[in-house]
Design a protein with these regions (language model features):
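Leucine/isoleucine-rich amphipathic helices and adjacent mixed helix/strand linkers
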Residues: 1-153
Length: 153
């Protein structure tokens, strides 16, 4: 926006807008290529990457790596968390084709750049059409774990 304000003429503003549009399309192409790399992985790895991205994109707040690991470790139609299904932090990063980063100080897992978030806000349904249903199933399963039957943990 500051770049547009600094333009002295109408022609300069139009040119700056064209460069901005090309930049957004270029970023979109980069993210599409990353998603194609994810789709080219084996089915289990691809599904894990889709779940990781789905959780990050739909979360109302940043997730810690532990929270994401536990969300990914929940299996539907189970009554407890099996820690054998918790993916490592290295796996969280590696299966997502460079789209996910972890902050070692804060323990937060996030998309690699704010433009990545913007891209997925525009396109998530085409990449992850079942993400909300999946997240709902996992949340219901988690809340149904035996540990919660006796009340608060």
């Amino acid at each position: 926006m500051n770049n547009l304000i600094d333009q002295p003429t109408k022609g300069d503003i139009k040119q700056a807008l064209q460069h901005l549009a090309k930049g957004i399309k270029g970023l979109d192409k980069t993210y599409e290529q990353a998603m194609e790399r994810i789709n080219d992985q084996g089915s289990h790895v691809r599904e894990l990457a889709e779940h990781i991205l789905g959780w990050i994109i739909h979360a109302k707040r940043p997730l810690s790596t532990v929270e994401l690991q536990h969300a990914l470790g929940v299996r539907t139609r189970t009554t407890k968390l099996d820690e054998d299904y918790l993916p490592s932090i290295r796996v969280l990063r590696s299966v997502c084709a460079g789209l996910v980063a972890t902050d070692e100080q804060s323990g937060i897992v996030r998309l690699v750049h704010y433009t990545t978030q913007q891209y997925f806000e525009r396109t998530w349904y085409s990449w992850f059409p079942n993400a909300q249903t999946y997240i709902t199933d996992i949340c219901v399963t988690y809340l149904s774990f035996d540990v919660f039957k006796t009340g608060f943990c």
